[in-house]
Amino acid sequence: MTDILRKIEAYKREEIAAAKSRVSLDELRARIADQSSPRGFHAALAARRQKSEFGLIAEIKKASPSKGLIRPDFDPPALAKAYAAGGAACLSVLTDTPSFQGAPEFLTAARAACSLPALRKDFMFDTYQVFEARAWGADCILLIMASLTDDDAHRLEDAAGALGMDVLVEVHDAEEMERALRLSSPLIGINNRNLRTFEVDLAVSERLAPMVPADRLLVGESGIFTHADCRRLEKTGITTFLVGESLMRKDDVEAATRALLTGSASAVAAE
């Protein structure tokens, strides 16, 4: 685990302990009972692949540790609607506050504004967070293999499955990919960003994609700015992409989303 991830785990553990003291697991279960059923995150992406279309997980992200504030006029419901109108298949919503200025209410509001399934984008360490995610309306959670033991990953995956949620398993190198493939989730995300240096290189996806059997659905993450980037990764078998920052910086998010997916109008420019 990198120093960055260790620091994140430390504050997340504190957050989790505080949350448990405020809201019991029984209360979360009650809130989950009042939620509508999960929308089918993997199913939405698989449907795009079935039709030989690019599948986009469009990210709602206000800020990041490496870039600071990304979008000052931050309106999650409006962004969700723009993404949906532009052709996105799913949403990813940051709920981590210290590093990304995210919040649970951003997830709830974005999902309520459209019909797309939503991922809780956060650092998951405890099954309590899985219950939180479903109580807030999430249809999918993220597991970052660099921050988890195999036992933790299995435990979190099982908790999500029991709640009818999907799991996106994120990797950055071959060792993490081998571990991810021992999980049952069909969704494997390859993060092209090095969490030690924050450098981004699409060659990471090109190296790791051949390791993945055809029954898994690969997601390219980070460093995807243009339709040409999507076409480049398509050659490796990756036709699903998680994109946030480059779209978040655009005035017309709907048009930028459409351009990224189809190549029409002006492609999304690298920031």
Swiss-Prot record:
PANTHER family in the cross-refs: INDOLE-3-GLYCEROL-PHOSPHATE SYNTHASE, TRYPTOPHAN BIOSYNTHESIS PROTEIN
Annotated pathway: Amino-acid biosynthesis; L-tryptophan biosynthesis; L-tryptophan from chorismate: step 4/5
Family (UniProt): Belongs to the TrpC family.
Lineage, opening ranks: Bacteria, Pseudomonadati, Pseudomonadota, Alphaproteobacteria, Hyphomicrobiales
GO MF annotation, one: indole-3-glycerol-phosphate synthase activity
Enzyme class label: lyase
Keywords, comma-separated and alphabetical: Amino-acid biosynthesis, Aromatic amino acid biosynthesis, Decarboxylase, Lyase, Tryptophan biosynthesis
HAMAP family in the record: IGPS_B
Annotated SUPFAM superfamilies: Ribulose-phoshate binding barrel
Catalytic activity of the protein: 1-(2-carboxyphenylamino)-1-deoxy-D-ribulose 5-phosphate + H(+) = (1S,2R)-1-C-(indol-3-yl)glycerol 3-phosphate + CO2 + H2O
Pfam families xrefs: IGPS (PF00218)
Enzyme Commission code(s) on record: 4.1.1.48
Keyword Aminoacyl-tRNA synthetase attributed: no
Name recorded for this polypeptide: Indole-3-glycerol phosphate synthase
Cited InterPro entries: Aldolase_TIM, Indole-3-glycerol_P_synth, Indole-3-glycerol_P_synth_dom, Indole-3-GlycerolPSynthase_CS, RibuloseP-bd_barrel
BP GO annotations: L-tryptophan biosynthetic process
